[in-house]
Amino acid sequence: MRNSPVSPGPGYAPARGSERARRRGVARWLAYVGGVFAGAWLATQLYYAVQIAMWSVFDPGSSAFMRADAWRLSNAQPATTIRHRWVPYDQIARTLKRAVIASEDADFANNSGYEVDAILQAWEKNRARGRIVSGGSTITQQLARNLFLSGERSYIRKGQELIITWMLETLLDKERIFEIYLNSVEFGCGVYGAQAAAQYYYRIPASRLSAWQSARLAVMLPNPKYFDAHRGSPYLAQRAGVIARRMGAAELPASQ
């Protein structure tokens, strides 16, 4: 008996089968792409973790920020001299250690690398501005950013910064974190680390910095290039006085 004119006809089932096959193909492709991205993300995290674990024994040669900044300066200001010299933790004046903690992260010795209140305040500030203008960063977060990440401001980068911060706090003790920070943080145009800063600004080694010199260096950290070019700024002197008064209460991380 012939098919009725209103019946679906013999091509109906194959069409449905073809649609199911197409959907399965799309699902497999999406799963493959997702797997590639997940694998790349995990490989990146493993790379960061291995690097950090190695730094419990070996000193970092440079940071991502230092390399990017040196490249930028070589193009924009080719006459700039890059200054950086690593020195052991015990060859950095205690006055500078206290000044940096008083200026950047008063609870560094006791926090877990994060200050939740500061992060929430930064979130509210960023939401009000409609863009990222503040990060609420601790010393460990600053180090995470300087060691591995670019200078762009985005929530994705901030998330990666928090993951690296957790790795640093898990794999290194506080004193080692602080030692790496003090040897890699920017103190001026092409000036990285405590030893280079002490020699550049005061012609002395980092071990001989006075309390006032240390306070002056510490207050430069939020905007080192600007304060390098404006060393006579009244704000710089006023803020250094505030830091000098706080230094006595600054708690250094315990030696392990």
UniProtKB/Swiss-Prot annotation:
It is an enzyme of class 2 (transferase). It catalyses: [GlcNAc-(1->4)-Mur2Ac(oyl-L-Ala-gamma-D-Glu-L-Lys-D-Ala-D-Ala)](n)-di-trans,octa-cis-undecaprenyl diphosphate + beta-D-GlcNAc-(1->4)-Mur2Ac(oyl-L-Ala-gamma-D-Glu-L-Lys-D-Ala-D-Ala)-di-trans,octa-cis-undecaprenyl diphosphate = [GlcNAc-(1->4)-Mur2Ac(oyl-L-Ala-gamma-D-Glu-L-Lys-D-Ala-D-Ala)](n+1)-di-trans,octa-cis-undecaprenyl diphosphate + di-trans,octa-cis-undecaprenyl diphosphate + H(+). Its EC number is 2.4.99.28. The chain crosses the membrane at residues 26-48. One of its GO terms (biological process) is cell wall organization. Pathway: Cell wall biogenesis; peptidoglycan biosynthesis. It is a single-pass membrane protein. It is found in: Cell inner membrane. The keyword Lipoprotein does not apply. Peptidoglycan polymerase that catalyzes glycan chain elongation from lipid-linked precursors. PANTHER family: BIOSYNTHETIC PEPTIDOGLYCAN TRANSGLYCOSYLASE, MONOFUNCTIONAL BIOSYNTHETIC PEPTIDOGLYCAN TRANSGLYCOSYLASE. This is Biosynthetic peptidoglycan transglycosylase. It comes from Burkholderia mallei (strain ATCC 23344).
